[in-house]
Every structure is written in C-alpha cells, then in structure tokens.
A protein has these predicted regions:
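C-terminal transmembrane helical hairpin of 12-TM major facilitator-type secondary transporters
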Residues: 257, 263-266, 297-374
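Helix-loop-helix hairpin linking two adjacent transmembrane segments in secondary transporters
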Residues: 155-217
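Intracellular juxtamembrane helix-capping segments at the cytosolic ends
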Residues: 41, 126-140, 147-148, 366-379
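Extracytoplasmic gate region of multi-pass secondary transporters
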Residues: 34-39, 163, 242-319, 402-407, ...
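Hydrophobic core of transmembrane alpha-helices in multi-pass small-molecule transporters
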Residues: 94, 108-127, 352-366
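C-terminal membrane-cytosol helix-exit motif in multi-pass small-molecule transporters
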Residues: 198-230, 452-459
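Central cavity-lining transmembrane alpha-helices of secondary-active solute carriers
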Residues: 55-73, 304-317
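C-terminal ends and interior cores of transmembrane alpha-helices
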Residues: 89-106, 336-348
Length: 469
C-alpha cells in the first residue's frame, strides 16, 4: 500500500493509474498526425485549397478543447473510468466513419471529414483527455510536475508511433521507426487508414480507461506531508471555476498558454508539408515518384521525431519545474520556443530543420505538462478537471489560430508537378504547392517572446473572499 490516513480499504498501487494514462494518451496523441494525411488527401481532392485541407486539423483541436471542459466536469462528477471509456468510443467511431469520405465529391467530402474526423474525433479526445491527468494529479500530490508530465507524455508520443503507421497504411510498405524497417504493411489507402486507426484507438482507450480510478478521500502518499503556505502568502484553497475565472491570473495564464500552443500546433500540424516544401523547392520538375516518396517519408519521419521531443518535453520540464519552480521553467520555455520559431524558416537542411521543430516540440510538450500543474498549484485539486477544462480552451484557440496562420500567411512559391501511381498502378501527374511559411513562423515567435514577459509578471492569486480568513 502507498497511502496512510483516511483510507479504510486497501489502496491500489498508484502506478497502475499511470499505465492506464499512458495507454489512453498515446492513442489520443494521434491527433498530431494530420500532416501525414494532408498530401494524400490533396492528391485525391485536388480542388481543396491549403486552407481547406487544414480545416479538419483546426476543428478537431477546437472540438477537443471545448470537450475538455465538459469531460473535466463529468469526470469530477462520475469518475474518470466511465468518461474515458465514452471518449474512446466516440473517437474510434468518428475515425471509422471518416473512412467513407472517399465516396463523396470534393465539397461534400470535406464536410463529412469535418463531422466525423474533426467534430466527433475532437469530442472523443476531449472527453478522455482530462481523465488521466486529473486522476494522476490526485494520486501524486508529492510529484505533481513530474506526474503531469508523465500523464501527458503519451499524448506527445502518439505521433511517434502512429505517424509512420499511418504513412505505411496509406502507401503500403515498411513500418519504420527512427529509420529502422520493422515490418511490412499492406496498402490501405488514406480512407481505409482512418478505419484501421479508428479500431485501434477504440480498443486501446477502452482498455486503458479500466485502470483509472480516483484515490479515496483524504489520501496522501506514505511519508508525505503537504507543504504549508508561506507566512503572509496565499492560503491553499480550492477555487470553484467561477472563482478561478474571476482572477486576473487565470486570464494572464490563458493568454500565455494560447501563445505557446499557437506556435507548437502550427509546427506540429504543418511539419510534414513544410519539410516537403523546403525539399522540393530547389528540385527540377517533374519530381519522380521515388524522389517524392522519399521526401514524403522524410516528412513523416520529421513528425515522428518531433513527437519524441514533444513527449520528452512533458517529462523533462515537469521535473525541472518541481525543482526550479513553474514560473522559471515557463519563462525559459517561451524564450527558447520564440527564438526557434524566428529561425525556423532558415533551417532548410534536414538536420537543421529537425533541430528547429524539435526545440519547438520540446517546449510545447512542457506547456501541456506545466499548465495542469500550475492550475492545481493556484486553484487546488478539488475542481481540477473542470478548472483545467476552462484553461485548456487556450489550447483549442491555439489549435485554430496556429494552423490558420500557417495557411493564411503562407505565400505560394510554386506549383510543382510530381509523379504518383493510382489504384491501378498507373503513373499519374499531380501538383504539390510549395509554400513559404516565414510570416507565420515570425508571428508565432513574437507571440512566445511576449508570453515570456507576461509570465515574468505572474503572481499566485489570493484566496477567494469566501475562503479568506
């Protein structure tokens, strides 16, 4: 047993909750692989513009963030297991229904993909996402920064496993991790890939959800005593959502979280097409099928490597924040992310490109780990699911604005023809839009630098009037 005090019945080993959290979050983290689907979908629906093909990625993140509010509220009320299970069923069902997208014309297909992949998928992700985070924080008050990092690390790692899986399913061939050919997979095409992934997500999330349960009332880890507030400092109380929203600190945190998510999600959702633009721009058209395939594979690999740093950042920055403080860690992250975004457009060599996007991914992962911990530090854990749901709307706003900025501020450099093969194995010529993303990168970089300044001004909130003594 790992508890003392209030629990009269045996207490489960709290690390089983972490196992369930990782299973769920790895599956949910596949939301970050959209850039792998982008080029194949444009190849099928050539009438889609850059903004249109980005739209499902924006909407899935917005639906995700909005659903976190209600998911947090429901898990506070009904417990994490049932809410996470329902989320897995909705996400898996939405992905399975998305496989019918190819049966529609271009306009109707976009609407169908938005309804199934984006809206249903986002609602399912949001319902399940907050459950493992809130549960882990309650089981690990002694390691709050580290454990929130672990709880969301799987979310960042999801793309590492599922980006190359989606790439292999779409085009057939080897499933590759870090350049190693592990096994071969049949060619399913982009639409049947939605079906396969939907089934995987549904089963995995439902299984992981069964490991989630809240600790008994009054639980605290063996040998741990809660730290006492500093003399003259804010008391440690639990804010209701209404009380939290009334504090200026909430809105300052929201703005900075929004800035970090705008930069991070801009890179994550565009990592593959941005690299393809960098690689194709200096080549002489038409691009041969094998050359284009190698460039696309490198783009998928960039998504996977980015996912490693996204995931690692959640653990690394969580641990750092436990030692140095949340505020110091956030300031360093915003500065690093801002500088990386400002320099990213000049990183045209593949190795440099990986360095740039991985720096952004490392910081973005840290935001996802530290903001739940900050909300718990500032506003208590009693209403953490609901409170963090409101904070998480900043992520949804960043998920809309980041990819939108990349599409809206992109300047078309060229329309380059490349060779591909159709379902019958015949060579066909398609067009790839080579874009310049400098304005989008610079805008997001400046936002991060401003966020660093705002974070420097941050102070803990005073307790609400009803709780003040």
């Amino acid at each position: 047993m790992e508890a003392q005090g209030a629990a009269a019945r045996p207490v489960m080993n709290r690390w089983w909750v972490v196992v369930g959290a990782l299973i769920i979050q790895i599956s949910l983290g596949a939301v970050y692989i959209w850039s792998v689907f982008q080029t194949p979908l444009k190849g099928v629906f050539q009438a889609w513009t850059e903004t249109q093909v980005t739209l499902p990625a924006q909407i899935v993140l917005a639906a995700f963030a909005l659903a976190v509010i209600f998911g947090g509220r429901f898990q506070d009320r009904f417990g994490p297991r049932i809410v996470a299970t329902i989320g897995g069923l909705i996400l898996g069902g939405g992905m399975i229904l998305a496989c019918f997208t190819g049966r529609f014309s271009a306009g109707a297909a976009l609407v169908w993909l938005i309804i199934t992949y984006a809206v249903l998928g986002g609602l399912g992700i949001g319902a399940a996402y907050v459950c493992p985070i809130a549960t882990c924080v309650k089981w690990f008050p002694d390691k709050r920064g580290l454990i929130t990092g672990l709880a969301v690390a799987g979310f960042g790692a999801g793309a590492f496993f599922f980006a190359p899986l989606a790439k292999a399913f779409v085009s057939g061939g080897y499933y590759q991790l870090l350049g190693a050919n592990l096994f071969t997979l049949p060619k399913l095409g982009v639409f049947n890939t939605f079906l396969a992934l939907g089934l995987i997500f549904l089963v995995a999330i439902v299984i992981g959800a069964q490991l989630l349960r809240n600790p008994p009332a009054g639980y605290k880890p063996k040998g741990w005593d809660p730290p006492q507030p500093a003399v003259g400092g804010p008391a440690r109380v639990d804010f209701t959502p209404r009380q939290m929203l009334a504090t200026p600190q909430f809105w300052l945190l929201w703005i900075t979280y929004f800035a970090g998510c705008t930069a991070g999600l801009q890179v994550i959702m565009k990592a593959s097409p941005v690299w393809q633009s960098f690689a194709i721009a200096p080549l002489t058209p038409p691009i041969q099928a094998d050359t284009f395939g190698a460039i696309a594979a490198a783009g998928a690999m960039a998504v996977a490597v980015l996912a490693i740093f996204n995931s690692a950042g959640r653990i690394v920055w969580g641990k750092i924040s436990d030692n140095l403080g949340r505020k110091t860690a956030l300031i360093v992250m915003f500065l690093l992310c801002g500088v990386a975004m400002l320099a990213l457009n000049s990183f045209r060599a593949y190795g440099l490109y990986l360095v740039g996007i991985c720096a952004v991914g490392l910081c973005f992962g840290g935001y996802l780990a530290l903001y739940p911990a900050v909300v718990a530090d500032f506003y208590g854990t009693k209403h953490l699911g609901f409170n963090y749901g409101w904070m998480f709307t900043a992520y949804g706003a960043g998920g809309i604005v980041g990819p939108f900025l990349a599409a809206w501020l992109m300047r078309v450099h060229a329309e380059v023809p490349y060779l591909s093969t159709d379902a019958a194995g015949q060579a066909v010529e398609k067009l790839f839009t080579v874009g310049n993303y400098q304005l989008a990168f610079v805008t997001a970089g400046i936002m991060c630098l401003v966020a660093a300044v705002l974070t420097f001004l941050l102070k803990a909130p005073r307790p609400p009037r009803a709780a003040a003594v």
